[in-house]
Amino acid sequence: MIKKILISQPQPTSEKSPYYDIEKAYGVEFIFRPFFKVEGLNAKEFRNQKINILDYTAVVFTSRHAIDNFFKLAKEMRITIPEDMKYFCVIETIALYIQKYVQYRKRKVFFGTTGKIADLVPLMAKHKEEKYLVPMSEGHNEDVTKLLDAKKLKHQECIMYRTVDNDFNEEEKKAFDYDMVVFFSPMGVKALYKNFPNFKQDNIKIGTFGQGTAKAAQDEGLVLSLQAPTPKYPSMTSAMNAFLRDQEED
């Protein structure tokens, strides 16, 4: 019987999150506990890259972390972002998040439909005159650079944040009694084994989001009970709802 589920992500900020509906429907408890956290660079670290934000006419956002840290650094460095700055986002949900910092205007905000940078590039190519700044995480690969170079776009990648471990303390390690653990990135899988080098799956169910995460879990010998996204279940919550429903029927 699955009752206690570890979700390796931050707790949802909205009270209307589907996770809470699932808890009520199936009598389960979700524990939200990220295995790593995102830390923004400070102004001094960013200045070391010798990049002037105001030299650019458009910003490309691949995540909410990128948005948060872009505007945090701008504020820290007392930079006023021009009204006519354009924003290109990999998907609409990220584009809408910009409203937290600036007024949302359709002529300034553009977004893709799949969440993949490769599918945003053709839209960016329609605005060849723009100079694109792309906030990234420390340790990023060169995929974005290659995609933008291929379209001959004027662009500059920059590091604005990094991922750091969010290790379990001794008390958390002793209290690790979950019936199911859900991972959202390969880093989460690595973090589990860093905190629990002798981890044995036994009867614990494992869920993963994304192909890379599933592969990382399987490479560690974990047996997966739940994988998302799928055409039928595009989100983890929709997949989780179906999974728990099936468990009840068995």
Identify the meaning behind each predicted range.
Residues M1-D250:
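Conserved beta-alpha
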